[in-house]
């Protein structure tokens, strides 16, 4: 499940697909603005993201007559989800840093454990690139961090829609009521 944006894929693709990707790109753009001073090799990616953002805004938000209430709601939802993802990634970063300190290790040592360079592990920790599942499993096994704290469990927007349709299709009231009882409503599926 992809919840964290991979800068390489977006730049390779050359455009922003939808509102959630747009919000993720905005967050990544802000992160790059902060780190590019110390990492000049990221300046080109920063500039390319700026062009993608500008193009998306011109195509989707430039004409006021085409901006509907639905589009605004979609944007608000995407912004909320992207912010939840950002907070999750920030908490994960802090949790990993805390464990590194407890084990008397530093970020560079983590890079050695995961087989990554010093600069790449910095990009992973700062959310410029996503950790691989393999990396997160190794971190889980070495440091005893729960997988739920390492791997985002938010359901992507497209899957939410499919899941809502599937729940309606199944039409099993007993199943649905158990879901509601166990999880105080089905809304938990969509956060």
Give the ranges of each region predicted by the language model.
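Short, charged recognition helix plus adjacent turn
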Residues: 151-191
């Amino acid at each position: 499940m992809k919840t964290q944006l991979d800068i390489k894929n977006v730049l390779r693709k050359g455009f922003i697909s939808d509102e959630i990707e747009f919000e993720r790109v905005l967050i990544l753009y802000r992160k790059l603005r902060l780190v590019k001073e110390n990492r000049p090799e990221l300046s080109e990616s920063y500039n390319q993201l700026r062009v993608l953002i500008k193009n998306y805004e011109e195509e989707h938000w430039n004409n006021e007559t085409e901006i509907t209430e639905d589009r605004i709601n979609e944007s608000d939802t995407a912004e909320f989800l992207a912010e939840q993802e950002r907070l999750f990634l920030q908490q994960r970063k802090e949790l990993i840093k805390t464990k590194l300190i407890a084990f008397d290790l530093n970020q560079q040592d983590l890079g050695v454990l995961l087989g990554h360079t010093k600069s790449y592990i910095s990009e992973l920790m700062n959310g410029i690139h996503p950790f691989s599942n393999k990396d997160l499993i190794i971190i889980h096994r070495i440091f005893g961090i729960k997988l739920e704290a390492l791997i985002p469990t938010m359901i992507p927007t497209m899957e939410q829609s499919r899941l809502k349709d599937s729940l309606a299709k199944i039409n099993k009231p007993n199943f649905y009521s158990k879901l509601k009882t166990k999880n105080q409503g089905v809304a938990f599926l969509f956060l």
